Each structure stands twice: as structure tokens, then as C-alpha cells.
A protein has these predicted regions:
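Extended non-globular C-terminal regions
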Residues: 130-134, 253-256, 288-296, 304
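Short beta-strand and beta-hairpin "edge-sheet" elements
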Residues: 1-23, 27, 262-297
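Short intrinsically disordered coil segments
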Residues: 35-42, 151-153, 294-298
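Acidic, small/polar-enriched beta strand-loop surface segments
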Residues: 137-283, 303-304
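Ordered hydrophobic segments in well-structured contexts
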Residues: 1-7, 118, 173-175
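Short beta-strand-centered interaction patches in the first periplasmic/extracellular domains
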Residues: 10-29, 78-170
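Surface-exposed cap/loop segments at beta↔alpha junctions
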Residues: 1-82
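Generic solvent-exposed, charged/amphipathic alpha-helical segments
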Residues: 58-63, 105-110, 262
Length: 304
């Protein structure tokens, strides 16, 4: 089973050897733009995607950035281009500087209710590896899975080692700016000041997001609300190390970034004992058996 996929990036040669990096699929897509092939000119029509699910819009964005260009094909299965839904997106060629496919996909994922989007390698046949775009639906933005794996931490034992917890206070207000210039620039505000107005208040924290590629005010409001929903709670982020030599630990390839897991904690100073639903954000390691797992930020259980 393939676990890591990349394209050969910058290569450096010496008289004795060569070295190169692997570029991820998002790095490749950051160098492709969502523009209709053969029709880039002043006044050219926009790419309009209407009445589709967000993951179908993402699939179409991927097609325009790959199959829709000469020598643009990449070994990616984009999925259903026609899945119906209540979403629309318009991409104007004059806004090309904001239309790298990677940026567009990130904005689709980060809008309020946006789906998780990931790329997973698989063996297309005995000799070829392809990628499959896996994305959540409009009804359930998370990537589907068959089994929820369990990890546990407690003093002296458990399948988790080196547990660390980073804490972050809430963001109560988000300013968003959209298309336009100077006084004509579109703006939107999302706020919830509940934490500022309680008896022992949190100090107000504000964020600003820019979405200059959209002149749709409702979409701009969705970006602002999406950021507020993500950051409003007092948050914590758990990072831990697991040893693949431990039979209690799931194997690489059994879990992927984006998967839900259960983390059982007992005796940690700043997290109450209990079982916590967590979502795997990142996995890292080397050729050894130790793997570092970083989970998505979650609502801080010590602040509830």
C-alpha cells in the first residue's frame, strides 16, 4: 500500500550523487490556475459552477487545473463532477492572481460548512500509483471511515507517549474584506462577544481575513462565520508520540490525516480524565518506529 506520494521537485547534482525533494500534490496545484484554456483575454467569460456540492466544485476546479490544460494531466481521480447541491462559484479570468488551484481548494474547505479535502495514494495496477481526492459531503464535511481507532495515555503505560497540550484563548470577532478597492471594498463582520461579557471575561481577540477573489457578499459572510466558528471556543491542541512496535498502535495506512480517533486520558494535569473524540491532523516521522501525531484543535475541556 502506498503511503506517501510526491513528484520530483528541485534536483541537485554532484559528481558523485544527486538529491531531490518531493513536491506534494498541493505544491503542484499551487502552480496551476483555474482559467479556461485558450480563452484568456480582456472580457473573457468566467468559469461558472452552479447548483453543485462543494466537493463537486472542488473536482471541477481540479479538472480545469489539470486535464483542462496541455500537458496538464496528473494521476488524480477527482470524483463526481456533477454531484448536485446548493452551491455556486464563479472564477473570473481577470482575477487570475488569486486563482491558483491550491488556494481555491483551501478556500472551499475553509468556508462555513466546507468539506475536508485530502488526497490518498493507491495502486492503480501492479506498477502505477494514482491519487484519489477524498472529500466530505455537504451533509457531513468530514472524510468517511470504517473504524474509529483508540489511543490511551496514563502514567507508566498506554499506547501514547510524550503527550503535550497547547492551549489557546477564544477569538470573539472576525473582520472579512472582499473584492473592491478603497471605499468600495466589500466587508463583513462575524462576532460573538459572550466570553467578553461574562463575570470573569476573556480579553477580546480579533482576526482579519481577506477574500479579494470574490464579489459575492454572502460568500464573504460565510468565510467570516467559518473562521469564527473554528476559533471562537477556548481551544487546545494535542500532540503525542506513538511507537509502531507497540501492537496497540494502529499501523500506518490504517489511519490517515482527517480520520476521527478516540483519545483516552487519565492522570494528565490539565486535561480532565475521560475519552475525547479527536481528529488526526498530521503524521510525521522517519525510518524509525516513532511517529508523531498532531490532532486538530478541539474545544478545551478544562474551560467547559
Amino acid at each position: 500500500m502506498p503511503l506517501v506520494f510526491g513528484a520530483i521537485g528541485q534536483r541537485t547534482d554532484t559528481a558523485l550523487d544527486t538529491s531531490f525533494s518531493l513536491d506534494s500534490v498541493m505544491t503542484l496545484l499551487s502552480q496551476r490556475y483555474v482559467v479556461r484554456e485558450g480563452d484568456f483575454r480582456k472580457g473573457a467569460p468566467a468559469i461558472s459552477l452552479d447548483n453543485l456540492s462543494l466537493r463537486a466544485i472542488a473536482a471541477n476546479v481540479g479538472w480545469y487545473a489539470t486535464e483542462g490544460k496541455p500537458a496538464g494531466s496528473l494521476p488524480i481521480d477527482w470524483g463526481d463532477f456533477y454531484e448536485r447541491g446548493g452551491h455556486e462559484r464563479t472564477y473570473f479570468p481577470w482575477n487570475v492572481s488569486n486563482l491558483s488551484a491550491a488556494d481555491v481548494l483551501e478556500k472551499i474547505a475553509n468556508v462555513e460548512g466546507g468539506p475536508d479535502i485530502t488526497f490518498r495514494p493507491y495502486m492503480a495496477d501492479a506498477h502505477h500509483v494514482r491519487l484519489r481526492m477524498v472529500a466530505g459531503s455537504d451533509a457531513d464535511p468530514y472524510v468517511g471511515q470504517d473504524v474509529v481507532r483508540r489511543l490511551q495515555w496514563f502514567h507508566g503505560a498506554g499506547s501514547v507517549h510524550s503527550l503535550t497540550v497547547a492551549h489557546l484563548g477564544p477569538v470573539e470577532r472576525v473582520y472579512a474584506t472582499g473584492a473592491g478597492t478603497e471605499e468600495e471594498k466589500d466587508v463583513a463582520l462575524a462576532e460573538d462577544l459572550t466570553y467578553c461579557r461574562q463575570s470573569d471575561p476573556w480579553p477580546i481577540v480579533e482576526e482579519c481575513v481577506s477574500c479579494t477573489d470574490s464579489d459575492d457578499h454572502a460568500l464573504l459572510e460565510g468565510h467570516a462565520r467559518g473562521r469564527l466558528v473554528a476559533d471562537w471556543w477556548p481551544l487546545c491542541q494535542v500532540t503525542c508520540t506513538v511507537d509502531l512496535a507497540d501492537p496497540q498502535v494502529p499501523r500506518i495506512g490504517e489511519v490517515w490525516p482527517g480520520d476521527a480517533m478516540t483519545l483516552a486520558v487519565e492522570g494528565f494535569p490539565t486535561i480532565p480524565d475521560g475519552e475525547y473524540p479527536v481528529r488526526l491532523m498530521e503524521m510525521s516521522g522517519d525510518l524509525g518506529t516513532l511517529v508523531t501525531l498532531k490532532f486538530d484543535p478541539m474545544r478545551d475541556p478544562a474551560e467547559t
